[in-house]
């Protein structure tokens, strides 16, 4: 009886091995699902980037507004008769006097008389 139980247990393990660890087992399916989810997120990011680039290409093909904007911001170009004005944030003030030295060590707790 003990031998039959052991044999059945070994057969059960032999049947379970492909289910969990085989080529189409649960662990492999779980890993593939994780990879599909990661790739889906990556593809969505690429779709957004492609849509942005497609819109930019259409702007460049259809009108001069996008070309003019790029020339202004990326190349620093101005039209004839325009004056370029740039506002710069003020730098923090630097004190002309050096910082005060630290106070000398005082004796604390002696009563001070």
From Swiss-Prot:
| Membrane-spanning intervals of the chain | 4-21
Q: Give me the Cytoplasmic side stretches, as residue ranges.
A: 1-3
Q: Name one GO cellular component term.
A: cell septum
Xref: InterPro entries: Cell_div_FtsB, FtsL/DivIC
Tell me which stretches of the chain form a coiled coil: 34-64
Which GO BP terms sit in this record?
FtsZ-dependent cytokinesis
Q: Which residues lie on this side of the membrane: Periplasmic?
A: 22-113
Keywords of the record, alphabetical order, are: Cell cycle, Cell division, Cell inner membrane, Cell membrane, Coiled coil, Membrane, Transmembrane, Transmembrane helix
Q: How does it sit in the membrane?
A: Single-pass type II membrane protein
**Which residue intervals make up region (Disordered)?**
93-113
Q: Name one Pfam family in it.
A: DivIC
Task: Give the main location.
Answer: membrane
Where on the tree of life does the source sit, at the highest rank?
A: Bacteria
Q: Where in the cell is it found?
A: Cell inner membrane
What is the stated purpose of this protein? Essential cell division protein. May link together the upstream cell division proteins, which are predominantly cytoplasmic, with the downstream cell division proteins, which are predominantly periplasmic.
Cite the record's note on assembly. Part of a complex composed of FtsB, FtsL and FtsQ.
The text of the family note is:
Belongs to the FtsB family.
Task: Provide the protein name.
Answer: Cell division protein FtsB
Source organism per UniProt: Cupriavidus metallidurans (strain ATCC 43123 / DSM 2839 / NBRC 102507 / CH34) (Ralstonia metallidurans)
């Amino acid at each position: 009886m003990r031998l039959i139980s052991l044999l059945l247990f070994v057969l059960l393990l032999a049947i379970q091995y492909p289910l969990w660890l085989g080529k189409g087992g649960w662990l492999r399916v779980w890993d593939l699902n994780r990879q599909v989810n990661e790739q889906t997120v990556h593809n969505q990011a690429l779709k957004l980037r492609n849509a942005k680039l497609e819109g930019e290409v259409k702007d460049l093909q259809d009108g001069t507004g996008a070309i003019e904007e790029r020339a202004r911001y990326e190349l620093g170009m101005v039209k004839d008769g325009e004056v370029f004005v740039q506002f710069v944030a003020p730098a923090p003030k630097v004190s002309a006097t050096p910082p005060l030295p630290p106070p000398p060590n005082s004796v604390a707790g002696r009563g001070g008389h």
